[in-house]
Amino acid sequence: MVEACWDDNNNKWRTLIKRFGQEKEMGEDYTVTSDFLVSAVGQLNTPKYPQITGLEAFEGKTMHSARWDWDYNIQGKRVGIIGTGATAAQIIPEIAQHTSQLTVFQRTPAWVMPRHDKPISKTRQAMYRYVPFARRRYRAKLMDFRESVFEASVLPQSARHSHIANVSRSHMLTQLPSCASTKLRAALTPKYPFSCKRIIVSDDFYPTLLHDNVKLETSPISEVTPTGIKMADGTHHDLDLLILATGFRATEFLNTIRLYGTGGQSLSDTWAKGASAYLGMTVENFPNFGILYGPNTNLAYNSEILQIEAQSLYVTRLISAVLTQKRQGNTLRIQPKPEVVANYNDEIQSRLSQSTFADPGCTSWFKDEHGRITTNWCGSAVEYQKRTCYLDWSDYVILGSGAKEVEKRGVERWRRRVEETWVSDRMLGICAAAAVMAAITGWVAWAH
């Protein structure tokens, strides 16, 4: 997919599909016509390649972590990996056991939290299988914990913010305890506030850096040579494979696709000062268009699936309205009012400005080139679910022969998917105790 244009005359989207490589053998380029268009490419889809002198001159194997070559055998190879973010923290422990030498090139250290991975005992597995309530309760408690991390990690004024940062520091001391690790700990200690960049959750990243065949390199990279990487201090690392764990062009939403809305207005022009959308899903002047995992919907502390599920339910209502009117022989064109989009984004930007993400001393993929936070959501996952479990039709410009019928609906509501606990442990205990007392009282009465 390379281009999508809204046809004002026919109230349709026309999407151009180009065939590349072997797909050319299947036929020519073609156009798909639709009543509604949904972008489900998300935020993390286009690899970001580092601007390093000589990168293209490297004669060994180079691959971005998001474009992994599974046919390449790393066994016994001298491997370099650029980056120590979330992707690198997952790759490094896995490949270190197969390489003859692994050099980790770090520009900025990351805050690392413990994952606490451990096997679930057979007893607990049986309990979760045969006592569904116990399984659901455990899952809900996990959700409660993840939601509690929001305030502690994202809001610097929170009483728990310094505590959770200390948990990360203790995790490092636990995993790198020896005096010999003093220099390594210093190199891995962040000099920026906790949570202003993406936090790594790992139990095996730090220990892997202690392996004899693993070296952490913190000197700036000078250039890539045909045989490896030369550092600013003159050191040269010979490599067979160079892995680029350098992330994605996260703030450049839909950057590989040309989108044109009403009057031929391009999405790139609309978002010239930063991507924004109403509830992260709909954009002014782009009718019958929805986005999943769009601007300001990323969660830095909980599962993104929660957001995408909420968005899917919302966008489905928009699609349903368009298709229902089409079946009745009517046309329908839905787009958010500009003032609604503006007010919504003013609110979330105001809240985000008070978060750790906005720290001026911190650069991250959460911010665009202007310093505006365009990726992250400003609240908890539950708050977002509650804000997207209803559709207020007055928020939208509705045109077409079916417009009046849709406008009369007012506000449509649906039940959100509740993942958190409904009742506290204390209340459960009181209810259980009351049930036991009632049972005993009943038994005594029956016995007499």
What are these regions (language model features)?
Residues 1-43:
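Feature captures the FAD/FMN-dependent oxidoreductase FAD-binding
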Residues 23-36, 73-77, 232-241, 245:
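Core beta-strand elements of the Rossmann-like FAD/NAD(P) dinucleotide-binding domain
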Residues 111-114, 126, 132-133, 139-144, ...:
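C-terminal, flexible cofactor-proximal segment of oxidoreductases
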Residues 52-62, 227-280:
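Central helical "cap/lid" subdomain
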Residues 1-14, 71, 212-232:
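A conserved short coil-to-beta-strand element within the FAD-binding core of flavoproteins
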Residues 37-180, 214, 237, 266, ...:
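Rossmann-like dinucleotide-binding core of oxidoreductases
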Residues 14-16, 183-200:
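Helix-loop-beta segment of a Rossmann-like dinucleotide-binding subdomain
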